[in-house]
Amino acid sequence: MKTAFFQPDIPTQPNDHKILGNVLPGADALAISEISEQNQNLTVVVTPDTRSAVRLSRVLSELSSQDVCLFPDWETLPYDTFSPHQEIISSRLSALFHLQNAKKGIFLLPISTLMQRLCPPQYLQHNVLLIKKGDRLVIDKMRLQLEAAGYRAVEQVLEHGEYAVRGALLDLFPMGSAVPFRLDFFDDEIDSIRTFDVDTQRTLDEISSINLLPAHEFPTDDKGIEFFRAQFRETFGEIRRDPEHIYQQISKGTLISGIEYWQPLFFAEMATLFDYLPEQTLFVDMENNQTQGERFYQDAKQRYEQRKVDPMRPLLSPEKLWLNVDEVNRRLKSYPRITFKAEKVRSSVRQKNLPVAALPEVTIQSQQKEPLGQLRQFIEHFKGNVLFSVETEGRRETLLDLLSPLKLKPKQIQSLEQIENEKFSLLVSSLEQGFIIEQSLPVAIIGEANLLGKRIQQRSRDKRKTINPDTLVRNLAELKIGQPVVHLDHGVGRYGGLVTLDTGGIKAEYLLLNYANESKLYVPVTSLHLISRYVGGSDESAPLHKLGNEAWAKSRQKAAEKIRDVAAELLDVYAQREAKKGFAFKYDREEFQQFSATFPFEETYDQEMAINAVISDMCQPKAMDRLVCGDVGFGKTEVAMRAAFLAVMNHKQVAVLVPTTLLAQQHYENFKDRFANLPVNVEVLSRFKTAKEQKQILENLAEGKVDILIGTHKLIQSDVKFNDLGLLIIDEEHRFGVGQKEKIKQLRANIDILTLTATPIPRTLNMAMNGIRDLSIISTPPARRLSIKTFVRQNDDLVVREAILREILRGGQVYYLHNDVASIENTAEKLTALVPEARVIVGHGQMRERELERVMSDFYHQRYNVLVCSTIIETGIDVPTANTIIIERADHFGLAQLHQLRGRVGRSHHQAYAYLLTPPPKMMTKDAERRLDALENLDNLGAGFILATHDLEIRGAGELLGNEQSGQIESIGFSLYMELLDAAVKALKEGREPSLEELTQQQADIELRVPALLPDDYLGDVNMRLSFYKRIAAAESKAELDELKVELIDRFGLLPDATKNLLQITELRLLVEPLNVVRIDAGTQGGFIEFSAKAQVNPDKFIQLIQKEPIVYRFDGPFKFKFMKDLSDNKVRLEFVVDLLRTIAA
């Protein structure tokens, strides 16, 4: 900001301490920005808590031209049994590393973090490794260096501090780096360093060098552990021999949770942040820091007293881990500093006041006769310029609407420097609390909080990357030994692992399946397309078939007959839908791209696929009916907005139907936001509007003056008349009642319909999978960095208190779910007594609606930080600061519901926690235990879709699909049922009767006696190998195989011969599919190709071959074509068979 609004008096000498008074709420960021611009050195800002540090870093990033760095807190409680998330350690190490050379900029941290003792600067200096392209480095030596630096060896690199070695490739994700890297070695030289995408694992850009920081804030190599042991013995004396004792655990290299609280034992002497700072650093200190610092230290002492009694975890005293406030003050005397005070101070050499004044009351009072009275009065009497600050583009539109009665049209400016040129201006920024700058021409800054009451501090969401929703249901990657699988020809067996067998000197890998009576079946990996996971009931109730027995064939025959009827019924519905004529929307590429460009995040792969599918549906003349299924917070709303944009640009109206008023309000704000710069009128029908306003909206709707209308079931009442409705968007359809669904059906006649859902309830999942509705899955996990940590715990006051404290101390909020309205108030009282630090409020569905809105709104605006609630929050509003959910009696909920509830948290850049509280195991059903296990283990997937299929396994298919079908599914498994159904629908569409032979069509049996596998020294992880085998076997074209080949080379290095053979044999299978070949067999002396009786091949090809080389070729019976030739070389044999088949197929 070039026009300084006040001249700060910058102290430069040690212990030169100035006071800046009159720093009103909101003005602190402006004052810091001015100070750091004028200061020639680094400015360190110390805040009373994490929340204010986060707020200031957000505002300063917008206002200041300086680099702004937030040094994060561990986000754990003193002496916690949790460790900080890797992401936090990564940011801290990176900040400390760069701090040593920082000359200027703003460095923010809360007082509790300034009090923390840290690793000494030498630790980082000596343990940073610079790796450059062209360096000579033995890969095994590099592996040892990584181990010594605390990096974890994994199969696939996903998080900071991990590495993986595959042949000549080394993947690693250095601490402090935004992306992971892949190093390609040629002998002992680094041939290339490339970044790669965590989700697809494919490489991106080439770079020349990387800095490798250690993986922890303490050394974990042998020397470090040895030093720890000596210090531990010296500190605590006698050691228990119990293997669970922390000393024994760390001695054998186990980094236990909460190990950070023994960090001083890894160093001869600890440092503090002061040891990292340049001498001339200027400190800016907030008024409440002393009080908060003392409170934190007292809290640490109290927790030390409570916890030091655990003989397995003897604790270090607080002074070993933190400085107390007196020590901090003493250290601060070595630096120049400025302390902010809210009150005015008496002016002197040391003390100065910030030239600002408080705004008078300008709140909009919607209940009053003249809502804008106070604002009007202020503007009429104020002699200077007025700047309105709003947080987003959409709120800018809302503000302009609000100001229209005053005939005000503020000019939008891009930065504070432009204030002076305009009487009324408007800035999109995070300055939410206003004040008046007193100068020759005063400036009044009016923030949203001044006009609308305190608003929430939004935390930015992360840009999200994506994984391809790889045939999740049929994928074998999750298989565990002993789980049931279905073989198309032999029925249901149990998975026994991958085994390598040597037959006639040729190594090949097989999938071992165990059947009844201890029979074993070895399935070659080239036939994995015949295998699918058994889904359809619990593992225990899955059948176990006998090999070579008729039972399986009968089950399959029976299921196939039933499936034919289902397919016919489906097609009937499908045909009716196809016959429905819709409106073919026109697509203007340029307009659409301009709108898309205003989306503030990067679209994920799935999101793009879903958007493209929706747009392409809308441009067809038939009516769209598409289900977009994606987890809570995965960007389904953006898909809906793009569809709405296309409809509105085609002069059609859009209705958005949502289950709750609060959700309607939130969608309204989001839509307003996105359509802010367009001539689009967005309205909402909800109880927030007066009867008069609702009437006006309905009149405008009928006249076509409203483009997008958002609302609850009010939208489908008979008095709502659209002028020209073109698109209906339904959010969470399963939440509407039967009567409401009927009304929606009547609306459906010929308009395009887009349904959004977070948990595909399996019935809708099935319909979508069968193509009655088109389905797009957005399975992109929320930013992979911080998935939701889920704990299943027996209900215990200590667990609850810790969980709530951990969250509110980092400035967050907690949902406490107690699903019994009769006792909910008692629970709230109990919590208030248990955690007096919390501000508790109650919300449930039996409250009067107005009251519930107020509760939710108060929680949203952070007036309370614990909401004791019923399942009303299931489709709640987005509260980005709520990052812990505690669910009582979690064993009473279904999987989909628990998943949905858990999705209410984890929407910002903080680690989110879900605690599922249960009674003792004796009081739970087996199913409930399995549900909770599934949820605890699925914390890192875009799991809504996967959970729906898990639900099919746990609940069985019966209650989901109606009993008629469930019998068939129990007997043959869900995956196979779906495959057969697909084939039946396809046949009927083409006007053919589906035959069982066709449904269970055999693929050619190919035996060429060459090694064809993914060797385990090439791809070590069994599940990943299984997954690739399945993907190779399921490939449907040469292009797909080529793509897999590129991916294998990119991720694991050059292909071994056996893998080249595997891909070539698969290509051969694709080549012979249309020829109806039953078997191909070739050995060292020749072989044969056997055709099925219904093969249709051109006999001329065979005649030409026999005439050309009668010694080599001949027929043996009507269906077997033989060749005799020396084929002892594997490569020659493979190429000969491929060429021969190409000739026949041509």
From Swiss-Prot:
Protein name, per record: Transcription-repair-coupling factor
Species annotation: Haemophilus influenzae (strain ATCC 51907 / DSM 11121 / KW20 / Rd)
Subcellular location: Cytoplasm
Binding residues annotated for ATP, in chain numbering: 630-637
InterPro entries the record matches: CarD-like/TRCF_RID, CarD-like/TRCF_RID_sf, DEAD/DEAH_box_helicase_dom, Helicase_ATP-bd, Helicase_C-like, Mfd, MFD_D3, P-loop_NTPase
GO molecular function: ATP binding; damaged DNA binding; DNA binding; DNA translocase activity; helicase activity; hydrolase activity; RNA polymerase core enzyme binding
Motif DEEH box, chain ranges: 731-734
UniProt domain Helicase ATP-binding: residue ranges: 617-778
Superkingdom per UniProt: Bacteria
Similarity comment text for this entry: In the N-terminal section; belongs to the UvrB family. In the C-terminal section; belongs to the helicase family. RecG subfamily.
Protein keywords: ATP-binding, Cytoplasm, DNA damage, DNA repair, DNA-binding, Helicase, Hydrolase, Nucleotide-binding
Location of the Helicase C-terminal domain: 800-953
NCBIfam families: mfd, PRK10689.1
